[in-house]
Curated annotation (Swiss-Prot):
Residues 1-52 are annotated as: Disordered. Residues 264-591 are mitochondrial matrix. Essential for mitochondrial network organization, mitochondrial metabolism and cell growth at organism and cellular level. May play an important role in mitochondrial protein synthesis. May also participate in mitochondrial DNA replication. May bind to mitochondrial DNA D-loops and contribute to nucleoid stability. Required for enhanced channeling of cholesterol for hormone-dependent steroidogenesis. Involved in mitochondrial-mediated antiviral innate immunity. It catalyses: ATP + H2O = ADP + phosphate + H(+). The chain crosses the membrane at residues 246-263. This is ATPase family AAA domain-containing protein 3A. Can form homooligomers. Homodimer formation at the N-terminus may be regulated by ATP and is required for the interaction with the inner surface of the mitochondrial outer membrane and correct mitochondrial homeostasis. Interacts with components of the mitochondrial ribosome and with other proteins involved in mitochondrial RNA metabolism. May also interact with protein involved in lipid metabolism, including STARD9. May interact with FAM210A. Interacts with GADD45GIP1. The keyword Hydrolase applies.
Length: 591
């Protein structure tokens, strides 16, 4: 049964590292120091031993040895022994791991403490450096302050020194000038006394010299007079006695006077004639009258105008049927008046802006075979005193036309205002009087056509000189459609089909679109519709492909309508508050 106690077990099985010895008991050291007399004797040691346990163990070993499960029991004992050894080894490993962990923790703590120590040392170094820098800055600032105070003190001392030196210099100069003045006064006084003394002493000599000079001067003058009289007398006597010389002299003086007077008046007359025939008055902005300078500059255009036939008065002018019939009668009457060399009638055309007044005046002149001249009423007031002369020049120039002249005054209400109620300057009043004087009677040389947006502001004398009043109202739906079609053809279709211009029109119903535009542009004038067509052309040119689409036309129409509404709002705001509830004047909207 020796295997049960591990005495005869196989080597290498279940053996592990030796277990650590238990720590010595506190009393072991003291027990080792006891004397030999204190040790118990062998007899006493085994006197209390009970062998019963050993007997039972030996008996159990013999039974187990003879048992058939002896080998399993041995293996079980060995496995238990190995398990215990493994447990001891794992505990040992845990102990070693704990020791290593404790060492690593100690290292980490030491590193943390060292890091904290380094951080604290760094912070202390930084604080010390900042404090030293602060002290250095304070020392530097103190040095600067001390240096500034020292500089200020030196500057103050220098200024005081300069002031003292300046005061000393000024005092020195004043003293020097005072002494010089005293010396000068003494010198002048001495010279005056010496001169007076010399004059008193030489008074008789001076009087004698003056008397001799006067006598000599008188004698010289008398001799000169006698000599000149003798010469002139002899010459006049010789001239009078010779009648041929007298006659020639009188004739020469007469011819000289006549020549000077004739040259002066001839130059003035020639200048006025050249100005009236060749030039153009300053008030005339545009004219179809041909001048010599224009013929020299543009001979081909002038020749075409000379051979051109009279045009239709309403070509390119779209009006309502009633207004068209009336203005056609005026055009026919004007043409027949020119043929019969009768007196022209004065016409007033009033209505909103952009309704075709200026265009009809030009067409009327071309239809009648007359020249036209356009002047603006706003150009008269700035001329001041020259306005009267300029107005007479205009009518003198108009009277020299061989074909007859249609004088169109645009914005005539700018200077033909009421003299009784309106506050106008004296120069403008004189210009108005000159205009009334030149238009007091009808003429067979020129026809006066006035255009105004506010005819109620005319002076009563102007109304008395008007023979025919024509109201140009805003176009209605039919006229607007005709205008839209005409300008669409002029500014869009013709540029798209003629030439090499970068303009194309998308495929849509042009007639239907023109009707829609005419419906949307209610209240707009012919000029606004023309501007709308020009805007279509500009939008097509500004597009990437140069194509005018229906959407682009609609966008421009909406913009034009909004702008027209904004203009109407401005027109309402411009009126006085007392007239805010009243509708606008008929001349601003319709007739």
């Amino acid at each position: 049964m020796s295997w049960l106690f591990g005495i005869k077990g196989p080597k290498g099985e279940g053996t592990g590292p030796p277990l650590p010895l238990p720590p010595a008991q506190p009393g072991a050291e003291s027990g080792g120091d006891r004397g030999a007399g204190d040790r118990p004797s062998p007899k006493d040691k085994w006197s209390n031993f009970d062998p019963t346990g050993l007997e039972r163990a030996a008996k159990a070993a013999r039974e187990l040895e003879h048992s058939r499960h002896a080998k399993e029991a041995l293996n079980l004992a060995q496995m238990q022994e190995q398990t215990l050894q493994l447990e001891q080894q794992s505990k040992l490993k845990e102990y070693e791991a704990a020791v290593e962990q404790l060492k690593s923790e100690q290292i980490r703590v030491q590193a943390e403490e060292r890091r904290k120590t380094l951080n604290e040392e760094t912070r202390q170094h930084q604080a010390r450096a900042q404090y030293q820098d602060k002290l250095a800055r304070q020392r530097y600032e103190d040095q600067l302050k001390q240096q500034q105070l020292l500089n200020e003190e030196n500057l103050r001392k220098q200024e005081e020194s300069v002031q003292k030196q300046e005061a000393i210099r000024r005092a020195t100069v004043e003293r020097e000038m005072e002494l010089r003045h005293k010396n000068e006064m003494l010198r002048v006084e001495a010279e005056a006394r010496a001169r007076a003394k010399a004059d008193r002493e030489n008074a008789d000599i001076i009087r004698e010299q003056i008397r001799l000079k006067a006598a000599e001067h008188r004698q010289t003058i008398l001799e000169s007079i006698r000599t000149a009289g003798t010469l002139f007398g002899e010459g006049f006597r010789a001239f009078v006695t010779d009648w041929d010389k007298v006659t020639a002299t009188v004739a020469g003086l007469t011819l000289l006077a006549v020549g000077v007077y004739s040259a002066k008046n001839a130059t003035s007359v020639a200048g006025r004639y050249i100005e009236a025939r060749l030039g153009k008055p300053s008030l005339v902005r545009e004219t179809s009258r041909i001048s010599v300078l224009e013929a020299l500059r543009h001979p081909i255009q002038v020749s075409r105008r000379l051979v051109s036939r009279p045009q239709d008065a309403l070509e390119g002018v779209i009006l309502s049927p009633s207004l068209e019939a009336r203005v056609r009668d005026i055009a026919i009457a004007t043409r027949n008046t020119k043929k019969n060399k009768s007196l022209y009638r004065n016409v007033l055309m009033y209505g909103p802006p952009g309704t075709g007044k200026t265009l009809f005046a030009k067409k009327l002149a071309l239809h009648s075979g007359m020249d036209y001249a356009i002047m603006t009423g706003g150009d008269v007031a700035p001329m001041g005193r020259e306005g009267v002369t300029a107005m007479h020049k205009v009518f003198d120039w108009a009277s020299t036309s061989r074909r007859g002249l249609l004088l169109f005054v645009d914005e005539a209400d700018a200077f033909l205002r009421k003299r009784a109620t309106e506050k106008i300057s004296e120069d403008l009043r004189a210009t108005l009087n000159a205009f009334l004087h030149r238009t007091g009677q009808h003429s067979n040389k020129f026809m006066l056509v006035l255009a105004s947006n506010q005819p109620e502001q005319f002076d009563w004398a102007i109304n008395d000189r008007i023979d025919e009043m024509v109201c140009f109202a805003l176009p209605q739906r039919e006229e607007r459609e005709r205008l839209v079609r005409m300008y669409f053809d002029k500014y869009v279709l013709k540029p798209a089909t003629e030439g090499k211009q970068r303009l194309k029109v998308a495929q849509f119903d042009y007639g239907k679109k023109c009707s829609e535009v005419a419906q949307l542009t209610a209240g707009m004038s012919g000029r606004e519709i023309a501007q709308l067509a020009v805007a279509w052309q500009a939008m097509a040119y500004s597009s990437e492909d140069g194509v005018l689409t229906e959407a682009m036309m609609d966008a421009r129409v909406q913009d034009a309508v909004q702008q027209h509404q904004q203009k109407m709002q401005w027109l309402k705001v411009e009126r006085p508050d007392s007239e805010a509830s009243k509708p606008p004047h008929p001349s601003l909207l319709s007739c």
